[in-house]
A protein has these predicted regions:
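Nuclease-adjacent, charged terminal/linker segments that flank catalytic cores
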Residues: 1-106
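Generic structural hydrophobic/aromatic packing signal, biased to beta-strands
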Residues: 63, 90-92, 109-111, 182, ...
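Short acidic loop-to-beta-strand element that houses the catalytic metal-binding Asp/Glu
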Residues: 93, 104-113, 123-129
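Short, well-ordered loop/turn elements at secondary-structure boundaries
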Residues: 104-106, 119-121, 188-190
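Protein-protein interaction/assembly regions in multi-subunit complexes
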Residues: 114-118
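Acidic, metal/cofactor-coordinating or nucleic-acid-engaging core segments within structured domains
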Residues: 132-204
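Intrinsically disordered, low-complexity regulatory regions
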Residues: 205-209
Length: 209
């Protein structure tokens, strides 16, 4: 059982002191294909570099960029959207509009299948949903970052506002509205939508029909 909430900081476990992990912490880099080399979570000039937090000793992803590791989610989505021999590429943060031309938000990743001449054959939408946090995760993060070597074994038990995954808000306030609104538009277009979540969050969701 973890005594503190930080599972990964700037892409690495907090007790990983390899040269790569140290470089990412020092320079506040993101190793998971962010749109820029640095972490930009919360604030670009003072990023909250927490990728995942512990719950019961298991890591729970709290940053959507964390899902981009090696772009495995794109491979999985393409296998769901297209035939096995399809050629495809991807675009990130694509604006979605409704029938009136009003913004319906952004699609996290659009996967596009094309033929030998580069003509579009099909596409599908991939949405990524990390888990919201209740409590205050910046306090233990800043405490750790002030002295990673000396505080990698920090004990945060008993601290006020101990950060924990908020599965209910993540599903009701974010995931369900996305499925209804964006999913409704894509359904009318007869296009598929895939949702990437991690296992702990998935296990809290009701069974879908």
């Amino acid at each position: 059982m973890a005594r503190q909430p930080l599972a990964e900081v700037f892409g690495f476990p907090i007790d990983n002191f390899s040269s790569d992990a140290t470089r990412h912490r020092t320079k506040r880099l993101c190793p998971f294909n962010n749109r820029v080399p640095n972490c930009t979570k919360d604030k670009a000039n003072d990023p909250l570099g927490v990728c995942s937090v512990y719950e019961g000793g298991n890591p729970v992803v709290t940053c959507p960029i964390r899902f981009r590791e090696k772009w495995l989610i794109a491979d999985d989505a393409a296998a769901f959207f297209f035939p096995p021999d399809a050629r495809w590429t991807s675009l990130t943060e694509v604006r979605l509009t409704d029938k009136n031309g009003h913004s319906a938000g952004n699609i996290d990743v659009i996967l596009v299948a094309y033929d030998d001449a580069g003509r579009l054959l099909d596409f599908g939408a991939l949405e990524v949903q990390s888990v919201y946090i209740s409590g205050n995760v910046r306090r233990p993060f800043e405490y750790y970052m002030a002295d990673p070597d000396g505080r990698s074994q920090l004990d945060w038990n008993g601290e006020r506002f101990y950060p924990r995954p908020d599965y209910l808000s993540s599903s009701i306030k974010r995931l369900v509205p996305q499925l209804i609104y964006k999913g409704g538009i894509l359904t009318k277009w007869h296009k598929k939508i895939a949702i990437a979540v991690d296992r702990p969050f998935f296990n809290t969701l009701p069974e879908l029909p």
